[in-house]
């Protein structure tokens, strides 16, 4: 059967891209379709098709392109006679429709579009163009969500959002995490081979709290710095993004050392996780792949009381839920997490293995 995998856009890194990677691995004969593809070498074994937006100045300008996305998804041209579509959606990709053809579609929902349904969780929802069209697009989005044969959500948290926004039920299929690879390596320090990264590794504090994400305001890495300061522990922040200068200014005023690691390799990133006393994750996330990775290398997690990331660990076993994301409450949770006994990383992360996802997603589209 000829299948088509669809995602809003394809970037060089990101949680949705990891899901799409595993979908492509699970369905090796499927084509891929996106609005634009900014990682052209990512799927060498697949035909990857872009929309007309990829050939315009709107390419990559997500907020500005938003008003044109619904009509773009409704006027697709089929490259083959597809038997099904599996759509990795977090904006409007689930609106996808081929002119003159009715292809059965299955939706894997990372979230109903935060831009229009939860702008308080995504600063891009404050863009003037987005605010202007949000009410209209909510009505349109709810109507289009009636079309799929079935919807899967990446967490119970998102399933509840799907019910509220789209008035549809969804089955929960957790995203795939490279748990087996993380467990197999053992000591990740030995995998760091770059000279500069070895110097970073060797200069790490003996005990520290870690924050990892893209540097954007809604990821709340500022709270990681403030919580580490309250707990009296050095802080390591890893990632990259537009909020770097603000975070560095905050770090300069902190009374504990704050180390920034920009664009770490996988080996260095997992070394940072493995050596950390606690991984702190204060953002409200739809799921949270990185907390699972931290647990897979044996590091406990601290998070706030709201979000899909609460489904990634067992409180009191491999992590602690802070009573709020106030820095003082996060600091108390850090202290409690450090005191936890060692946990079984394999057992804790088993439900998130790539093989589990592949089995469930095949069954979801009826190709088990």
What name fits each language-model region?
Residues 245-267:
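Nucleotide-activated donor-binding/catalytic signature segment of Leloir-type glycosyltransferases, i.e.
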Residues 314-328, 335-340:
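Conserved acidic donor-binding segment of nucleotide-sugar-dependent glycosyltransferases
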Residues 29-95:
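Active-site donor-binding segments of glycosyltransferases and PAPS-dependent sulfotransferases
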Residues 300-304, 313:
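Short hydrophobic beta-strand element within catalytic cores of glycosyltransferases
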Residues 127-151, 158-160:
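Membrane-proximal helix-turn-helix segments that form the acceptor-binding/catalytic region
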Residues 67-68, 325, 339-368:
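A charged, aromatic-enriched C-terminal amphipathic alpha-helix characteristic of glycosyltransferases
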Residues 209, 274-286, 299:
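Acidic donor-binding loop of glycosyltransferase active sites
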Residues 271-276, 361:
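Short alpha-helical donor nucleotide-sugar binding micro-motif in glycosyltransferases
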């Amino acid at each position: 059967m000829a299948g088509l995998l669809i995602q809003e856009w394809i970037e060089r890194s990101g949680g949705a891209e990891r899901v799409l990677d595993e979908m492509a691995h699970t369905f090796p004969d499927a084509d891929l379709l996106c609005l634009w593809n900014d990682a052209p070498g990512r799927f060498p074994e697949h035909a990857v098709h872009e929309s007309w937006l990829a050939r315009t100045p709107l390419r990559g300008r997500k907020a500005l392109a938003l008003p044109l996305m619904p009509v773009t998804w409704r006027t697709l041209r089929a490259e083959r006679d597809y038997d099904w579509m599996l759509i990795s959606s977090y904006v409007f990709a689930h609106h996808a429709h081929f002119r003159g053809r009715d292809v059965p579609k299955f939706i894997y929902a990372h979230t109903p579009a935060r831009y229009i349904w939860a702008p308080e969780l995504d600063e891009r929802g404050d863009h003037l163009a987005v605010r202007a069209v949000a009410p209209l697009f909510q009505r349109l989005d709810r109507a289009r969500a009636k079309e799929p044969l079935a919807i899967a959500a990446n967490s119970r948290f998102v399933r509840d959002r799907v019910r509220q926004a789209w008035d549809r039920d969804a089955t929960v299929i957790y995203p795939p995490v490279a748990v087996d690879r993380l467990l197999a390596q053992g000591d990740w320090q030995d995998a760091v081979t770059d000279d500069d990264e070895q110097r970073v590794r060797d200069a790490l504090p003996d005990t520290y709290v870690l924050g990892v994400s893209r540097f954007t305001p809604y990821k709340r890495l500022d709270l990681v710095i403030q919580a580490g300061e309250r707990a009296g522990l050095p802080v390591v922040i890893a990632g990259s993004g537009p909020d770097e200068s603000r975070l560095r200014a905050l770090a300069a005023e902190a009374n504990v050392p704050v180390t920034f690691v920009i664009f770490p390799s996988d080996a260095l990133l997992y070394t940072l996780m493995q050596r950390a006393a606690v991984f702190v994750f204060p953002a409200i996330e739809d799921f949270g792949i990185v907390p699972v990775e931290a647990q897979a290398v044996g590091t406990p997690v601290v998070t706030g009381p709201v979000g899909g990331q609460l489904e990634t660990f067992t409180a009191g076993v491999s992590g602690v839920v802070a009573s709020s994301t106030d820095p003082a409450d996060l600091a108390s949770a850090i202290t409690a997490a450090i005191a936890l006994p060692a946990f079984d990383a394999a057992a804790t992360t088993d439900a998130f293995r790539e093989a589990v996802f592949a089995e469930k997603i095949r069954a979801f589209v009826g190709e088990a």
